[in-house]
């Protein structure tokens, strides 16, 4: 079963050609690795509804990448991270910008950690990105290259100023 993020309900859902089933809220599933920290700047975030520091669920590769390649699971958990509001939609936020290669490596390491730790999302990550480490590296690099091509090679890569200690 593949898992995708459903914007309308703000939850992860199982993708089944016959039906869609909500399986869990996106924030807690992603928070297992991030431990209430923004993926990008390490600022403290919350997964508690209504909190001032409520984490956004962000697409690492811009959502508009769907227009570049329909086969990329842009709404899949392999491409979703928790982000503070400032990084996701603040004045100097990521929006549709391409993250730096350092952040791409961080995403790869996050996904590998979830796979090797036998996290409940392990099978979904493998299904979305590949069976082997090399396949998964290729998948992310291909998505990165597609993003650069689609968004623009001259576009400056985005990286925030750290707001906390790097804990992952």
Where do the language-model regions lie?
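Cys/His-coordinated zinc-binding microdomains
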Residues: 42, 85-88
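Short, charged surface segments at domain edges that flank catalytic/cofactor-binding sites
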Residues: 1-46, 64-74
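Extended charged
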Residues: 1-15, 95-168
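Short amphipathic alpha-helical segments
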Residues: 79-82, 120-121
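Histidine-centered nuclease catalytic patch
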Residues: 42-80, 93-107
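Intrinsically disordered or highly flexible coil/loop and linker segments, enriched in small
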Residues: 36-39, 93, 156
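The −1 position to Zn-ligating cysteines in a subset of zinc-ribbon hairpins
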Residues: 37, 56, 83
